[in-house]
Amino acid sequence: MPVARVLDQWFFLSGIDVVASPDTEGLVAFGDPLTDANLSTLDAHCRYPDQVARRLVKRRSGRSMGVMNQGLGGNRILNDLSGDSGLRRFDRDVLAQPGVTHVIVQLGLNDIFNWRGKPEEEVTADQMIVGLKQLARRAQTRGLWVFAGTLLPFENQSFRPSGVKPEREKTRQAVNEWIRGSGGDFDGVIDFDMAVLDIGHPSRLLPEYDSGDRLHPSDAGYNRMGDAVDLSLFEKLR
């Protein structure tokens, strides 16, 4: 008979629906392990969407808003890796969610790293931008507000050192430059990169925001990401 053991994952629960007032809005945080908060303290609720939710509860104006975390470890915009790619799962994990009105898209580092080393999965900034534009259009076609989050620094990351190449930092910078100027595609920008980078070394996380692998933020880093979200973005109505 198999030995029973306790795990810190769940395999049969994909979401929880709650009854809310008719005017309650819904925010989906759509992303990769930085949205799922890989390497954060277990059960400490330090994901950046957790911090956004806490701030929304405390604000004195605006409609009630629920926050749904659709972060997926290993996720990429363009190609499948750990589960379906962002482009393939967007309908299911965002557009099909009940009550969704706003979306934050923070996705792309795993595209840049190409963990599997397949030549056909080596992507350019232009290819990533095309994918991000498609996500924005699909959300806006459904009447949703959609915001883009910049990609975090990763110089000298030790999580999987094979992913570190000088040209990949150039790709990150090119994507971030486009995001910051993408007023015609997204409805707003959340500059997560600027919130957690080391000003003296902009291609690195600030040490206090680094979990230790120079890629995933610490609890303080994830909370800082949540503080970087301008809540006034959610007060506009189409």
Which residue ranges define each predicted feature?
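N-terminal secretory targeting modules
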Residues: 1-30, 35-44, 61, 234-238
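Oxyanion-hole/transition-state-stabilizing segment in secreted/luminal serine hydrolases
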Residues: 36, 40, 72-127
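Beta-propeller domains
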Residues: 34-80, 104
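C-terminal soluble interaction/assembly domains
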Residues: 110-114, 119-132, 140, 147, ...
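Catalytic His-Asp segment of secreted/periplasmic serine-dependent ester chemistry enzymes
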Residues: 87, 113-115, 151-238
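Soluble non-cytosolic domains of exported or imported proteins
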Residues: 42-47, 81-85, 122-129, 166-173, ...
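Structural recognition of the beta-strand scaffold that forms the well-ordered cores
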Residues: 26-31, 35, 65-71, 101-106, ...
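Alpha-helical scaffolding within the catalytic cores
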Residues: 11, 49-56, 82-98, 130-134
